[in-house]
């Protein structure tokens, strides 16, 4: 083989995946390093590329693109334990239609010497966050406002299930009456069994891994704005493999 042929062949080989490599990098940076090779492969296919996960992984390695997400445990706020509602979910997190099975919980963020408490409602059908409240303290009004916002979105008397742990706020008479008067069915996890509400735990772990642990914030106000932006991104853009490479809202 002549020298010119050798260098031509080497150049052709190195350029074979140049377009795909650029697109992989684009997807990686568009999502702030939150996507690993499997999710990037799914998004590549959404964009019309024929590529398998091994090739994506190779291109990422060559380009030194490493997913920055590491799932970490979190501790949600819980009060006294005392079950007042049955477990209607029983770890059956599958739903045939939107707004049929919902889950909620509270998680705590601690930064700049202060705390914030997030109370979202998660749709088991597609993983969408359909409503949420953010408070400085884990007070009952946070839960009631979250519930009222959820009812406004899904409508009254739908028979939807709203599942939670046995935290004190979910045992409160005002919360129970609000659900009952608007046709929502209350469901509670068993005592000390986090797996009964694992979809919420998974979401909180994802949220903290992809937002809190990846980003620097100027102050609490900056964090709050980024949190709102992240939930919007999560609902509208962040694809899920279990949804066939679609975001929650795209799947709905």
PLM-predicted stretches and their roles:
Residues 12-15, 78-80, 164-166, 172-173, ...:
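RNase H-like two-metal-ion nuclease catalytic core shared by retroviral integrases
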Residues 173, 180-184, 206-252:
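C-terminal domain-tail junction helix/linker
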Residues 1-97, 193, 247-252:
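Basic, flexible linker segments flanking DNA-binding modules
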Residues 91, 95-130, 137-138:
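An active-site-proximal beta-strand-loop segment
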Residues 133-155, 161:
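Active-site beta-loop-alpha junctions of metal-dependent nucleic acid enzymes
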């Amino acid at each position: 083989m002549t020298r010119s042929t050798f260098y031509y062949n080497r150049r052709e080989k190195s350029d074979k995946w140049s377009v795909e490599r650029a697109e992989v990098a684009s997807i990686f940076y568009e999502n702030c390093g939150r996507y690993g090779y499997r999710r990037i492969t799914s998004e590549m296919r959404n964009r019309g590329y024929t590529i398998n996960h091994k090739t994506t992984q190779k291109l990422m390695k060559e380009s030194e693109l490493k997913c920055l997400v590491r799932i970490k445990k979190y501790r949600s706020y819980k009060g006294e334990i005392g079950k007042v509602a049955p477990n209607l979910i029983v770890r059956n997190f599958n739903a045939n239609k939107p707004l049929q099975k919902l889950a909620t919980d509270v998680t705590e963020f601690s930064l700049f010497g202060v705390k914030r408490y997030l109370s979202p409602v998660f749709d088991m059908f597609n993983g969408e966050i359909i409503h949420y409240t953010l408070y400085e303290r884990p007070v009952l009004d946070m839960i009631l406002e979250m519930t009222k916002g959820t009812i406004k979105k899904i409508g009254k008397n739908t028979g939807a299930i709203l599942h939670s742990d046995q935290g004190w706020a979910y045992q409160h008479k005002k919360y129970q009456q609000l659900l009952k008067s608007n046709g929502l069915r209350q469901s509670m996890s068993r005592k000390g069994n986090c797996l009964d509400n694992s979809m919420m735990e998974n979401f909180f772990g994802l949220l903290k891994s992809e937002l809190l642990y990846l980003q620097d914030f100027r102050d609490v106000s900056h964090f709050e704005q980024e949190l709102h932006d992240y939930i919007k991104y999560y609902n509208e853009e962040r694809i899920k493999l279990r949804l066939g490479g679609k975001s929650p809202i795209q799947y709905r």
